[in-house]
């Protein structure tokens, strides 16, 4: 079970923009998150050839080298994805969090975090809604018959996590991500289907 903690809410925690995306933070924190994504990119680079990693070649409003997808027939709102991997099992929709310190997930699915160097637990936004938005857009692009595997990846090497079993979405540390992907259930897609899905996703990339 997740540890018993005292929750202390702090100002400016969990801010969201009007479109539901997390509010843009300071450049230092943006760079911190980018470092975590880069670390996961390196892990994915070593996957076997049967897996296709979607290239980060879009330009966004605040950063470049991202995956930015839009399906105007479904919604006029684009979504930025951290990582997408297509394999025989389906599409892995990976959301990366570069948290240091300690993370606990309680039985209700709430996230609690003690940042490195601090002594109090604070409420942290569960990324489940963000992952859900990405999943729905992805389904509109590839079709609802294609398996989509949602994953939350914790990329910082020093993160300590408890209560992973309380998350409906698998929470996987970076050093175990490749093993999770390679050994995830039996294959259902052919190499031709994997290539077709890659082309379809790439056709929905945009830059702003």
Region spans (language model):
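Conserved hydrophobic "DFG−1" position in protein kinase catalytic cores
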Residues: 85-86
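Cell-envelope/extracellular polymer assembly enzymes that use nucleotide-activated donors
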Residues: 82
